[in-house]
Amino acid sequence: HCGFHRPELKYRVTELGQMTPTSSTFSIDGHQFKIGVGGLYNIYNALAAYSLGRFLGVSPEQIQNAFQADEHVFGRQEIINVDGKEVTLVLVKNPVGLNQVIDMVLTDPEPFSFGFLLNANYADGIDTSWIWDGNFEKLNLPRIAHFFTGGERYKDISTRLRMAGIEQIQEEPDLTKVIDAIKKMPTKHVYLLSSYTAMLQLRKELAERKYIQGGMN
């Protein structure tokens, strides 16, 4: 025995409540919290913020107020209205985060469309093989009404989806045309996952068409 062991936890999630694509309820040390984003990974983030706040002497009530006042930042489950289509834009960049986002998306019980924009520039990572560790097989469900891919490496992500058993895929390599494609989606809600530079290109187009205030806002 070397004497090393896991330290005793000072703060822990004691209960998981309702989890949807747009909110999560949970308890930390018996204190109930709600955050305005979905995904188990965001509960981990909230636990980290809570732990630091309590270490600095911030009360649970103040932390809850901060959680409620928190705003979405670009690419982090922000919701953009595109002529009546509710587009949830999520940045993805590695398989662990991707699988967390897939699990988050699947908490939506309603029909939706699913898109993935993939580039392979240095800011994205020039090796796209990480997408093969994504659990795309989970998405082969009747309630996902439409699949589409885009970006410079759209063929890579389309191939991955087809290997997951998804045959009907709309492909749009030109990111300037993605917005028009979204308008024609068969569902009101569209989940759009994107690598970093593809997201910036899309946001530039969204800003030019006045759907958002600016490319980085």
Where are the regions a protein language model picked out?
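A short glycine/serine-rich beta->alpha loop
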Residues: 32-40, 86-88
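Active-site beta-alpha connecting loops in nucleotide-dependent enzymes
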Residues: 73, 91-171, 211-216
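Short glycine/threonine-rich catalytic loop with a Thr-x-Gly-x-Asp
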Residues: 37-48, 73-75
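Glycine/aspartate-rich loop-and-adjacent alpha/beta segment that forms the canonical ThDP
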Residues: 192-217
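Buried hydrophobic packing segments
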Residues: 46-56, 101
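Gly/charged, well-structured mid-domain segments that form the phosphate/adenylate-handling core
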Residues: 4, 16-21, 53-92
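Residue-level signal for inorganic ion chemistry
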Residues: 45, 49, 147, 192
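Extended acidic/charged loop-beta regions that coordinate divalent cations
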Residues: 1-32
